[in-house]
């Protein structure tokens, strides 16, 4: 059913933008009509408050079709700039918006009678939480679609060994997405009690006539495809991942920041990449056959000369380092030899006469030493 809904949405938007294209040929007027229609559809999705996947697909396809109908790269860039300025709301201002709503509603409720308005307060709070969660989800989807269109306009080519920060300009957008998802997870937890197991009853005469034998009720229960009570992980896995799987780096960073394990869809390409690398290493070990011996022997002479120059420079540097090491060792030896020598000033204050007298007195020990007779 979801695929049929997407096809219906795309057909309606194709007709909508085709009428805009047919109405005028001026690029400025056409761009203004596109932006007005996008703003209109955005406000309709918020006011409808469907809180369903169909509403999210509607705004995704609105932006996508408006982007594809732009003629030049400059027009597409201008549309992305307009989306960034007019549709994407900053996280602080979005939080401030609903904090102001909380204050005004609380003040109005305090002025009324408490007994009569207890039920009204609960319903107002429930509606406020649902509206807040819905706008948060729409903002998350718009930000991801903006990154998706930006990737289409400015593709990032990443080779092996490059850092993941090549698209570091998207880091602020990723941080904002993480903060919005964290807020949405708290809102989903608070609204899960309200909307858990909700169903809508629709009376359909055709269905009742066809199913009289099976059903005794006049209405058929249809579970709403709501994203309200499924939690943050289900919102990531079942809504975001299916629609923005090409934004693998963005999603991996989001999952990592939220400390949620990556799903298998994000791990598949990593395994394929490792398998391809292993296969490439095996190919390098194969001995070349006669057919590709000539290709292996075809060496550029300029590259060989460059290699010879590099080798000679390396040899010179090694010789210089060896000479420096020898000089250092010589200096250390001279310092050690100087330390082992007896200093010349050691016997300056000694008198020679005293030394002679000392030797003479030792020749006659009886004169020098007195003995005590017992």
Curated annotation (Swiss-Prot):
Keywords: Coiled coil. Residues 198-223 have a biased composition (Low complexity). Residues 197-223 are annotated as: Disordered. The keyword Coiled coil applies. Residues 302-342 form a coiled coil. This is Uncharacterized protein DDB_G0287499.
């Amino acid at each position: 059913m979801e695929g049929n809904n997407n096809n219906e949405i795309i057909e309606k938007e194709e007709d909508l933008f085709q009428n805009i294209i047919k109405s005028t040929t001026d690029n400025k007027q056409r761009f203004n009509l596109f932006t007005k229609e996008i703003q209109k559809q955005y406000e309709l999705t918020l006011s409808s408050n469907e809180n369903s996947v169909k509403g999210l697909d509607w705004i995704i396809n609105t932006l996508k079709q408006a982007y594809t109908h732009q003629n030049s790269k400059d027009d597409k860039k201008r549309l992305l700039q307009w989306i960034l300025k007019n549709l994407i709301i900053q996280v602080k201002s979005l939080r401030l918006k609903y904090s102001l709503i909380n204050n005004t509603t609380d003040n109005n409720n305090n002025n009324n009678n408490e007994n009569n308005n207890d039920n009204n307060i609960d319903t107002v709070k429930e509606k406020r939480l649902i509206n807040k969660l819905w706008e948060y989800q729409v903002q998350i989807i718009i930000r991801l679609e903006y990154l998706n269109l930006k990737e289409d306009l400015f593709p990032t080519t990443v080779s092996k060994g490059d850092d993941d920060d090549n698209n570091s300009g998207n880091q602020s957008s990723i941080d904002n997405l993480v903060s919005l998802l964290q807020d949405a997870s708290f809102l989903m937890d608070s609204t899960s009690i309200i909307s858990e197991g909700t169903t809508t009853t629709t009376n359909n005469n055709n269905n009742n006539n066809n199913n009289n034998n099976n059903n005794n009720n006049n209405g058929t229960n249809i579970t709403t495809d709501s994203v309200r009570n499924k939690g943050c992980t289900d919102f990531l896995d079942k809504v975001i991942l299916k629609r923005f799987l090409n934004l693998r780096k963005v999603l991996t960073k989001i999952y990592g920041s939220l400390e949620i394990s990556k799903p298998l869809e994000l791990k598949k390409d990593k395994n394929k990449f490792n398998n391809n690398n292993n296969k490439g290493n095996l190919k390098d070990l194969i001995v070349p056959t006669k057919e590709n011996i000539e290709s292996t022997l075809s060496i550029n002479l300029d590259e060989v000369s460059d290699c010879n120059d590099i080798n000679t420079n390396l040899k010179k540097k090694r010789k210089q380092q060896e000479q420096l090491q020898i000089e250092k060792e010589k200096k250390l030896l001279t310092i050690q030899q100087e330390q082992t020598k007896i200093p010349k000033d050691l016997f300056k204050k000694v008198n020679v006469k005293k030394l002679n007298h000392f030797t003479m007195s030792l020749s006659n020990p009886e004169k020098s030493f007195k003995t005590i007779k017992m």
